């Protein structure tokens, strides 16, 4: 009995007799491994290689026959690896390593999924589902900045919507379709660009159900909005008024397919830490109970232990939670993080003010102790990075009002007294001498 020898790829093998297998000249598979085999002069090709060749030719012919301007082509997304995405985020967002890593992986997989749809076959058994993202963290920790920075890095349209403005259809407020209209505006009405954009829904915790008990009064801005968002989050063709606002019977609508739009929802979820601590206390025994007792101090850092059941208890319906499978939390910003935010990112606040002063021909310098005072005041206000801009704007507004009218100024030094409002900045002339001010 002799063994069949598989020929090398690229060489055809004809059957030596009835029932003997033949092999594909391209991939080397035998006729027993594939559904069908097409014979040619001294060559064979299997159905799998035919299908692959068809896909390649279809793409190449389409590109040749339909050359279009870049803006009108099916919108390509610049696919960046998760590691490269995170390295880019590091240049703009301080800290929040866990959230940045989770976002980078989720965004990479989302756009990889979109690309795969172009070459996947209809008979493919594995269908990759959409993975929208939920960001949980105290105010001012960078939720919006993370989403916006990702959109900028990927060069996709981006829009921000406040969930508190949304109501059910038929009630005063914005329909949920409004969020798609804003994305359409952000993409300059390029439908294909819009259908691959990112929408950030802020204050998502504010549409939590007000009570676990079913009420006879309608919750038009709570559970009702969650129900209305389900279809959009999952992926559906939605008719959108081009100018936003309410739909009217005779109004022309633009149909947007949301299956490839990435939704990132964010919220502070005030009080969620207590629910998490209570759950951990109930489930902990022995030594673990001591750990849970410490968590019962309701440190916002406990948010990293959040589970979907906690969000359900908070007031989000299970169907809504299920459409936001990627769950990540952000940590409160401490003194070190706030100090870094002031000076380290590419678009740091200090660098922005320095650029504005440079346009007036003046060098701006912040004394180290002045930065300490800005951070201390921001911590007292408890609104995270947002407080930094508020503190600085309050200090700098008078200086920026007077400076353009002052002559011979080469340098402006901000001191701790300047931040406290008990002293003026130090001005130096262009030759380095101290400038007297009235």
From Swiss-Prot:
Residues that hold ATP according to the record: 138-145
Binding-site list for Zn(2+): 24, 27, 46, 49
One of the protein's GO biological processes: proteolysis involved in protein catabolic process
Keywords: ATP-binding, Chaperone, Metal-binding, Nucleotide-binding, Zinc
GO cellular component, one term: HslUV protease complex
InterPro entries: AAA+_ATPase (IPR003593), ATP-dep_Clp_protease_ClpX (IPR050052), ATPase_AAA_core (IPR003959), Clp_ATPase_C (IPR019489), Clp_protease_ATP-bd_su_ClpX (IPR004487), ClpX_bact (IPR046425), P-loop_NTPase (IPR027417), Znf_CppX_C4 (IPR010603)
Pfam families registered for this protein in UniProt: AAA_2 (PF07724), ClpB_D2-small (PF10431), zf-C4_ClpX (PF06689)
Residue ranges of every copy of the ClpX-type ZB domain listed in the record: 11-65
Family designation: Belongs to the ClpX chaperone family.
The protein's name in its UniProt record: ATP-dependent Clp protease ATP-binding subunit ClpX
Gene name linked to the record: clpX
């Amino acid at each position: 009995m002799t063994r069949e020898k598989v020929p090398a790829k690229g060489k055809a093998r004809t059957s030596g007799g009835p029932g003997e297998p033949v092999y594909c000249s391209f991939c080397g598979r035998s006729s027993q491994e594939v559904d069908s085999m097409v014979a040619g002069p001294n060559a064979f090709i299997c159905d799998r290689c035919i299908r692959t060749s068809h896909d390649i030719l279809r793409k190449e012919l389409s590109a040749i026959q339909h050359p279009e301007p870049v803006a009108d082509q099916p919108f390509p997304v610049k696919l960046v690896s998760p590691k490269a995405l995170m390295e880019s985020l590091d240049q703009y967002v301080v800290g929040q390593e866990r959230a940045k890593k989770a976002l980078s992986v989720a965004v990479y997989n989302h756009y990889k999924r979109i690309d795969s749809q172009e070459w996947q076959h209809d008979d493919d058994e594995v269908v990759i589902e959409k993975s929208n993202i939920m960001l949980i963290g105290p105010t001012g920790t960078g939720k919006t900045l993370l989403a916006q920075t990702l959109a900028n890095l990927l060069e996709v349209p981006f829009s921000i919507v406040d969930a508190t403005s949304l109501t059910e259809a038929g009630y005063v407020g914005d329909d949920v379709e409004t969020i798609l209209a804003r994305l359409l505006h952000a993409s300059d009405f390029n439908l294909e660009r819009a259908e691959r954009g990112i929408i950030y829904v802020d204050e998502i915790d504010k549409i939590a159900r007000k009570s676990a008990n079913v009420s006879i009064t309608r919750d038009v801005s709570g559970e009702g909005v969650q129900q209305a968002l389900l279809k959009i989050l999952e992926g559906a063709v939605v008719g959108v008024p081009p100018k936003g606002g309410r739909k009217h019977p005779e109004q022309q609508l633009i149909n947007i397919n949301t299956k490839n739009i990435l939704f990132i929802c964010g919220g502070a979820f005030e009080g969620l830490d207590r629910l998490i601590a209570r759950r951990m206390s109930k489930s902990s025994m022995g030594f673990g109970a001591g750990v849970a007792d410490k968590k019962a101090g309701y440190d916002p850092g406990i948010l990293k232990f959040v589970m979907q059941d906690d969000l359900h208890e908070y007031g989000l319906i299970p169907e809504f939670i299920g459409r936001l499978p990627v769950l990540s939390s952000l940590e409160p910003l401490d003194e070190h993080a706030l100090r870094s935010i002031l000076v380290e990112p590419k678009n740091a606040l200090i660098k922005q003010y320095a650029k504005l002063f440079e346009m007036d021909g003046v060098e701006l310098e912040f004394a180290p102790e002045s930065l300490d005072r800005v951070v201390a005041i921001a911590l007292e206000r408890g609104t995270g990075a947002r407080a930094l801009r508020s503190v600085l704007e309050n200090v700098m507004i008078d200086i920026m009002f007077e400076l353009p009218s002052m002559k011979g100024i080469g340098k402006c030094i901000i001191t701790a007294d300047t931040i406290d409002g008990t002293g003026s900045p130090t001005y130096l002339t262009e030759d380095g001498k101290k400038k007297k001010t009235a």
